[in-house]
Amino acid sequence: MSAEYGQRQQPGGRGGRSSGNKKSKKRCRRKESYSMYIYKVLKQVHPDIGISAKAMSIMNSFVNDVFEQLACEAARLAQYSGRTTLTSREVQTAVRLLLPGELAKHAVSEGTKAVTKYTSSK
């Protein structure tokens, strides 16, 4: 596991370096990923199993790819109906179109549950 889990840094921040140095080092830009969330889900499902950095990278690429496919499909659906705003309806339809059978049903129910929880907390 790397030090990136659970830590946030303000964009454009100094990253803890002193400004007194004459030589300016290249600023370390934080790379956003789903690693922390993938790891948490893994521990919920299989608490005794770990994951290698290579496998984590593959999983992160997979999540990014699925997210991009869903976003593109939802945007296409909104465009077809002449709308400029993505709603949960477009996202739900995109999930039904892209994911197979039982996986789509579970994804829709979990998504509905998450939206309900979010709206009730406001």
Swiss-Prot record:
This protein's UniProt keywords: Chromosome, DNA-binding, Glycoprotein, Hydroxylation, Isopeptide bond, Methylation, Nucleosome core, Nucleus, Phosphoprotein, Ubl conjugation
N6-(2-hydroxyisobutyryl)lysine modification, residue list: K31, K40, K43, K54, K105, K113, K117
Chain spans, region Disordered: 1-30
Record-listed Dimethylated arginine modification sites: R76
Positions of modified residues (Omega-N-methylarginine): R83, R89
CDD domains referenced in this protein's UniProt entry, alphabetically: HFD_H2B
Subunit structure and binding partners: The nucleosome is a histone octamer containing two molecules each of H2A, H2B, H3 and H4 assembled in one H3-H4 heterotetramer and two H2A-H2B heterodimers. The octamer wraps approximately 147 bp of DNA.
Function statement: Core component of nucleosome. Nucleosomes wrap and compact DNA into chromatin, limiting DNA accessibility to the cellular machineries which require DNA as a template. Histones thereby play a central role in transcription regulation, DNA repair, DNA replication and chromosomal stability. DNA accessibility is regulated via a complex set of post-translational modifications of histones, also called histone code, and nucleosome remodeling.
Protein name per Swiss-Prot or TrEMBL: Histone H2B type 2-K1
